[in-house]
Each structure stands twice: as structure tokens, then as C-alpha cells.
Regions:
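Acidic/glycine-enriched connector segments
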Residues: 4-148, 153-177
């Protein structure tokens, strides 16, 4: 048993791919957001699935529209119950912001873009109803030397059953460091 891995072969293969990509210079992003239902939660779940680091500021009491944000998400209360404060902090603490939306951005999604731009951070807006171009996404990441990516967009209540599901599929595709 000595010298043998305790990991299942599938895990070893996945870990091996990630090591090769790190050696090859592929970038591993740190994902940041406030943990709201919808796009934020999809980004955190994608990061956790893909073993990418994630963090962010959330409102006090870990408030989200669907109740308290689960403790397994590594978020820090921002000292205010106001979602705009966490939006500001997450925009400031990142190198760039990716916004996923359906059609034209609305209220909180606009605030995310506005705050990022106010802090001189580039913003990329992708529509949830369109297939993203992975190559163009990574070219944008490299062009702006992004290491910390704020990800935002509408809450789940904007389009129940759609926002999280589509965001998750897109983010699993875009953020996968083995691609």
C-alpha cells in the first residue's frame, strides 16, 4: 500500500490535468462575488466544483433573497445590510468583472458594472441566452491580466429556474482551467 495513491483514478486524472495546466501557464482565477441567488451562487458553485479559489463580501447576516447564504460559501459579511455595499467592495477587490445577464442589464446588475468601471476595472457582459466564446473569454482575461474575477448578474427571481441553471452551465464551461 505504501506509495499507492488513495485517490480514485478519476481524481488523479483530474488533478494531473490541473497540474499540467499550471505548469503550462494556464491561469487559475480567484472568483469573487456577494453570494446572491442566481448568477452569484452559480459562480461560487462552479468555482467550488472546479477547485478554484473563491471569496467575497456579502451583506450582514449573509442576507440573500432566498434566505441566509450557506456557510460553505467563503464569504465575509461587509458590515452593512445593504447589498450595494458588498457590490462596491467586490468590484473594488477584483481585477475585472464578468456580468451574465438576459437582455439588457437591470438594477443590481447595472450597479455591478457601474462600480467596476468607477474603479477602473474592465467589464465583460455576456448574455445567458447566447453560447459564450471560450477563446474570446480567455483572451479578454489575459489582455487585462485578470487574476481576481468578480462575477455578477441577476438574482434567481429575475427568471426563476433559468438564471442559476444557465449561468452554471456557462460558468462551468468558461472557468474550467483544464480547457
Amino acid at each position: 500500500m505504501q506509495g499507492e495513491s488513495l485517490l480514485p483514478e478519476s481524481a488523479e486524472t483530474e488533478i494531473g490535468k490541473r497540474i499540467i495546466n499550471v505548469i503550462a501557464g494556464k491561469r487559475r482565477l480567484l472568483i469573487v462575488n456577494g453570494g446572491q441567488s442566481g448568477v452569484d451562487r452559480a459562480a461560487l458553485d462552479s468555482a467550488l466544483k472546479l477547485m478554484l479559489p473563491c471569496r467575497g463580501w456579502c451583506p450582514d447576516q449573509r442576507w440573500a433573497e432566498d434566505g441566509a447564504i450557506a456557510s460553505h460559501y467563503p464569504l465575509t459579511p461587509c458590515g452593512s445590510p445593504t447589498p450595494a455595499v458588498r457590490t462596491e467592495l467586490n468590484a473594488y477587490d477584483s481585477d475585472a468583472t464578468l456580468v451574465l445577464t438576459r437582455g439588457a442589464p437591470t438594477d443590481g446588475t447595472n450597479l455591478t458594472s457601474d462600480r467596476a468601471l468607477a474603479h477602473g476595472r474592465p467589464v465583460l457582459i455576456l448574455d445567458l441566452d447566447e453560447q459564450p466564446n471560450v477563446v474570446q473569454f480567455w483572451e479578454w482575461i489575459r489582455a487585462h491580466d485578470v487574476r481576481i474575477l468578480n462575477v455578477g448578474g441577476p438574482r434567481e427571481s429575475f427568471a426563476p429556474g433559468v438564471v442559476y441553471t444557465r449561468s452554471r452551465k456557462i460558468l462551468d464551461l468558461l472557468l474550467d482551467p483544464t480547457r
